[in-house]
């Protein structure tokens, strides 16, 4: 029997969240493999999965075409490739109207796609995130030409549908309307065929076959049932008729369909699919134009602003090489039509600067002198020897990527400026697809299968974030569950299937899409969870696949720190102080970094970076660029760190390495001592050593970013080998280069990105070294951010001689401030840091502002005066008393609590009662009580360190102080104990976990190997005070303790509320 023609026109992917049970790519591949003529992805009121289906088909076609073009290709290979080219992918959406009517709309052409996208936008934007609402009249609201013009419509009747419904549908859509017949091997199939024939005949509607597909294979039915139960908040055993009665809602073979449907219904579906000729790659993005002044073109305005910027950047005259490069960049930007893109970013950056918001571009944009001239980036590409081809090239099939960081707590001002300038119909944030991870999958699958919440919680809590599915059986056994039990085994299977599945859309961290016309006709827009935000239904990868513009408006906490610190420095010095005022080659700053004294310093504060600093010993800015980039998985996995450090420590070894390299390769690697550290170097090596064009080199970079998932790098490796062989390089050199490229994988760090971050690393290091009080204020006032909690930042600052004064309601503002500013900024006396009321956990900013305002009018006489004039609530007074912030008004904590209890607040039941009895003199708390109260209220203490109080007990247990490790011989067996302040597990560490312990003398770095981490995971993950028995390892100035055994000493510190920043 010949395979009948068929195309599936009603198919939900897993982007119909918690409904569809297959990825769009799986559905496309399966439909093609079954011999379908086409497939429509029709997710519910959504086009979120459209690009995935589009790229899935493109990859299928590319692979089949490559096989067909191979010398050994058969006629069958060529036939398969041709059939893939003819396969029709249709874009549509399913809708349930408020009246209950169910429709599928299919885009006939570009206009129809725009109308479909606009309808989804309308339905989504009138509802809260995750829902939509559509009424019959909305179908006519999209266009005056009628009901969603240029779209075909399928009506999906149910048992309650009437002839009136059929007539309404026929009137609305006329010749564009079809009644879809959906059969799923049920006992009533024959009756339903008859009933749909009656409805169609009554309204003169044609019929076609459809499948209400939810999965590509029948085997996904258990997952589909589970998704339904999760969506409904029930179990698969209680979901009842909400579950499909069988597994027939998968892509079925056309021969099987031929036994269910009349042939003409199958043929009608195939014909309609072929009538839809819209494809996503025909979408054309149009840039905004209002940023161009009247009388100018985008090209002339960009050129004028670039030249003006160059004059500011090079006041002594633009070097000829720079001028030549600018002309080359401008010519290529104008040729590719990217001028409005650059001007859009320029406008946003100008707004931020006008508002005093610190910002800086990073990433590949730092390769561009045009970006540098416009003030978008701060790294001089000429000085840094960067590579413009990394940013823009003719061969790139996507726009350039410009990422700009803004102060993290003022970025919303920038976001609202963009919405205000372009309107919410033309600007929206890109989406981020939130996918299931192990714990979430475990919890949802467990609930859907009816497991008890205690069992689910116990298993989820026993997992660490790094645990994979193959470690679940061991966790189950620990909890007394049998992994071989059918029900438990099903739990594990479903958990594994859920991992990586999309669950819902969220908003991108800052990727804006801005268009000239209505954005909702390009991609659907929906409301974000955050107020005043809107989000498109496509994510970053979708936008890149279609070559659509995205402006990244990102948040960076260190910019907030630096801006706040610079303001305080200016106040202390009596004159404005900005980034350009920081001396660029300060020896004391580099001395500090070489000693790994970098707590709080941007990018070099992690334990891995601290371990590298004394080995690399940065003495100039470019050394910092390397420092930022080298402690990354790419250089580590590519085995580049040790050779670089060896060559840096031994100039003769470096000279020998460089001498062995061909001259063209030597020119690329000379600055990094013969070792490739940056992505740009890999790209340039491909050009000079293997003859790649700049565009091909950029394609290599992109393949490096995804080779682990997609294996795209293999074809480039062969091209590299062939190109190097043709240029006389031996095979050993070619193999070594390929190994290094693979090592970079998705973790290669661009030099342009490292240079941008190194600027901020140096600025923050200079502030720490020369203005530590202002820097501490900046760090505290910008929390949460960085690797360290306020407790560790305060400990470090005080060890550096910074005087820190406690939170005090008679002196503290909301933020930390400087006190005792000397009249002469060069005087030896330093200012003190007064902690802000923000440090009191739970104390509201509004209350702090009232306190400051009332205090500015007159000092507080007592707690009653404070409560009355600052209009404080009972809970706010209690928080101040518990934090010791009423010391100046009421004395110690117990006395303050007593006084606060006696304060009569306006509106209290007894606010007219007589004055309370005279205050009772209460004994002051003991030191340990004060310590516990400090940590409970603020997370830190300015008193003695908790371990100072325990030192005698620790000494009896032969636990060394952290400072003593520096004097301890290599390989010595020692014991150390400390408050856990951080746990880290780098992706390249092969299961090793790095733990930071703090005591009264400093920090100890502990290395816990994977085996011990698994055996003692409870102690490792749960201890607040951790004892470690281990062997000391010394490499130069770097000291680590290799753990042999862990002991949870937390009972020794009672209820101490110490906070650790884990796996940050």
Curated annotation (Swiss-Prot):
It is found in: Cytoplasm. It comes from the Bacteria. It is an enzyme of class 2 (transferase). Its main location: cytoplasm. Its EC number is 2.7.7.7. One of its GO terms (cellular component) is cytoplasm. It catalyses: DNA(n) + a 2'-deoxyribonucleoside 5'-triphosphate = DNA(n+1) + diphosphate. Belongs to the DNA polymerase type-C family. DnaE2 subfamily. Keywords: Cytoplasm, DNA damage, DNA repair, DNA replication, DNA-directed DNA polymerase, Nucleotidyltransferase, Transferase. SUPFAM superfamilies: PHP domain-like. This is Error-prone DNA polymerase. InterPro entries: DNA_pol3_alpha_NTPase_dom, DNA_pol3_finger, DnaE2, DnaE2/DnaE/PolC, DNAPol_HHH, NA-bd_OB_tRNA, PHP_dom, Pol/His_phosphatase_N. The keyword rRNA-binding does not apply. DNA polymerase involved in damage-induced mutagenesis and translesion synthesis (TLS). It is not the major replicative DNA polymerase. One of its GO terms (molecular function) is 3'-5' exonuclease activity. The keyword Lyase does not apply. One of its GO terms (biological process) is DNA replication.
């Amino acid at each position: 029997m010949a395979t009948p023609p068929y195309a599936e026109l009603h198919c939900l992917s897993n982007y119909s969240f918690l409904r569809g049970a297959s990825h769009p790519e799986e559905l496309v591949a399966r439909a093609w493999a079954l011999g379908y003529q086409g497939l429509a992805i029709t997710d519910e009121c959504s086009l979120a999965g459209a690009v995935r289906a589009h790229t899935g088909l493109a990859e299928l076609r590319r692979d089949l075409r490559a096989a067909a073009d191979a010398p050994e290709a058969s006629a069958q290979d060529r036939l398969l490739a041709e059939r893939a080219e003819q396969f029709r992918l249709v874009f549509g959406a399913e809708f349930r109207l408020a009246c209950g009517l169910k429709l599928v709309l299919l885009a006939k052409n570009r206009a129809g796609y725009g109308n479909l996208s606009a309808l989804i936008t309308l339905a989504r934007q009138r509802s809260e995130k995750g829902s939509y609402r559509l009424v019959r009249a909305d179908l006519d609201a999209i266009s005056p030409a009628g009901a969603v013009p240029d779209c075909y419509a399928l009506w999906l009747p149910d048992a309650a549908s009437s002839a009136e419904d059929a007539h309404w549908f026929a009137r609305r859509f006329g010749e564009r309307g079809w009644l879809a017949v959906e059969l799923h091997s049920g006992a009533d199939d024959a009756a339903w065929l008859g009933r749909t024939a009656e409805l169609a005949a009554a309204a003169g509607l044609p019929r076609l076959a459809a499948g209400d597909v939810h999965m590509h294979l029948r085997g996904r039915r258990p997952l589909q049932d589970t998704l339904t139960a999760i969506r409904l908040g029930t179990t698969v055993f209680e979901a009842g008729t909400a579950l499909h009665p069988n597994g027939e809602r998968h892509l079925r073979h056309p021969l099987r369909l031929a036994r269910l449907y009349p042939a003409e219904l199958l043929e009608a579906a195939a014909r309609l699919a072929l009538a839809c000729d819209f494809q996503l790659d025909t979408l054309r993005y149009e840039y905004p134009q209002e940023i161009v002044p009247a009388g100018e073109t985008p090209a002339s305005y960009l050129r004028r602003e670039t030249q003006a910027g160059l004059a500011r950047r090079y006041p002594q005259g633009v070097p000829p090489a720079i001028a030549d490069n600018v002309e080359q960049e401008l010519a290529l930007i104008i040729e590719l039509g990217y001028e409005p893109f650059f001007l859009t970013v320029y406008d946003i950056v100008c707004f931020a600067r006008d508002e005093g918001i610190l910002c800086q571009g990073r990433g590949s944009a730092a390769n561009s002198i045009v970006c540098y001239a416009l003030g978008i980036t701060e790294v001089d590409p000429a000085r840094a020897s960067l590579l413009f081809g990394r940013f823009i090239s003719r061969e790139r099939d996507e726009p350039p990527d410009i990422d700009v960081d803004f102060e993290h707590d003022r970025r919303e001002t920038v976001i609202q400026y963009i919405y205000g300038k372009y309107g919410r119909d033309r600007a929206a944030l890109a989406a981020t697809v939130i996918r299931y991870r192990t714990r979430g999958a475990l919890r949802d699958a467990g609930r859907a299968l009816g497991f008890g919440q205690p069992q689910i919680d116990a298993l989820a809590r026993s997992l660490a974030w790094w645990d994979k599915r193959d470690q679940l059986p061991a966790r189950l056994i620990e909890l007394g569950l049998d992994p071989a039990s059918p029900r438990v085994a099903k739990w594990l299977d479903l958990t594994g299937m859920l991992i990586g599945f999309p669950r819902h859309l969220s908003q991108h961290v800052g990727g804006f899409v801005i268009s000239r016309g209505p954005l909702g006709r390009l991609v659907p827009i929906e409301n974000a969870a955050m107020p005043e935000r809107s989000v498109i239904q496509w994510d970053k990868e979708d936008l890149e696949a279609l070559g659509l513009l995205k402006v990244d408006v990102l948040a960076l906490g260190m910019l907030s720190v630096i801006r706040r610190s610079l303001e305080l420095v200016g106040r202390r010095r009596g004159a404005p102080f900005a980034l350009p005022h920081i001396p660029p080659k300060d020896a004391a700053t580099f001395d500090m970094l070489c000693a790994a004294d970098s707590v709080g310093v941007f990018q070099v504060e992690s334990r891995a970076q601290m371990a590298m600093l004394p080995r690399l010993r940065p003495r100039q800015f470019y050394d910092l660029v390397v420092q930022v980039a080298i402690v990354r998985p790419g250089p580590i996995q590519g085995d580049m760190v040790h050779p670089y450090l060896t060559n840096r420590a031994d100039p003769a070894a470096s000279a020998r390495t460089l001498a062995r390299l061909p001259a063209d390769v030597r020119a690329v690697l000379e600055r990094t001592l013969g070792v490739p550290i940056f992505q740009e170097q890999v790209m340039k090596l491909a050009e000079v050593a293997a003859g790649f064009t700049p565009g091909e080199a950029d394609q290599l970079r992109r393949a490096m970013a995804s080779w682990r998932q997609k294996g795209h790098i293999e074809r480039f490796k062969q091209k590299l080998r062939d190109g190097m062989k043709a240029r006389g390089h031996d095979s050993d050199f070619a193999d070594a280069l390929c190994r290094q490229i693979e090592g970079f994988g998705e973790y290669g760090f661009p030099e342009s990105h490292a240079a941008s971050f190194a600027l901020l690393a140096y600025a923050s290091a200079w502030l720490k070294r020369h203005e530590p009080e202002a820097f501490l204020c900046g760090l505290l006032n910008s929390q949460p951010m960085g690797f360290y909690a306020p407790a560790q930042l305060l400990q470090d600052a005080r060890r550096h001689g910074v005087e820190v004064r406690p939170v005090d309601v008679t002196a503290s503002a909301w933020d930390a401030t400087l006190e005792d500013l000397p009249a002469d900024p060069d005087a030896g006396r330093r200012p003190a840091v007064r902690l802000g009321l923000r440090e009191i956990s739970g104390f509201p900013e509004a209350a702090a502002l009232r306190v400051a305002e009332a205090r500015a009018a007159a000092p507080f006489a007592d707690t009653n005066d404070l409560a009355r004039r600052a209009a404080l609530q009972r809970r706010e007074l209690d928080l101040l008393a518990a934090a010791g912030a009423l010391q100046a008004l009421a004395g110690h904590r117990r006395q303050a609590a007593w006084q606060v209890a006696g304060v009569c607040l306006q509106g209290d039941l007894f606010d007219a009662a007589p004055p309370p009895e005279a205050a009772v003199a209460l004994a002051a708390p003991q030191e340990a009580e004060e310590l516990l109260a400090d940590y409970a209220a603020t997370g830190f203490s300015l008193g003695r360190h908790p371990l100072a109080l325990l030192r005698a007990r620790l000494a009896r247990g032969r636990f060394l102080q952290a400072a003593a490790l520096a004097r301890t011989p290599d390989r010595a067996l020692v014991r150390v104990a400390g408050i856990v302040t951080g746990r880290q597990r780098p992706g390249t560490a092969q299961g090793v976990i790095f733990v930071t312990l703090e005591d009264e003398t400093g920090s100890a770095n502990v290395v816990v190997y994977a085996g011990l981490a698994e055996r003692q995971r409870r102690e490792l993950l749960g201890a607040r005070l951790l004892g470690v028995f281990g062997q000391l390892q010394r490499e130069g100035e770097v000291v680590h303790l290799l753990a042999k055994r862990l002991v949870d000493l937390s009972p020794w510190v009672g209820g101490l509320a110490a906070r650790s920043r884990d796996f940050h």
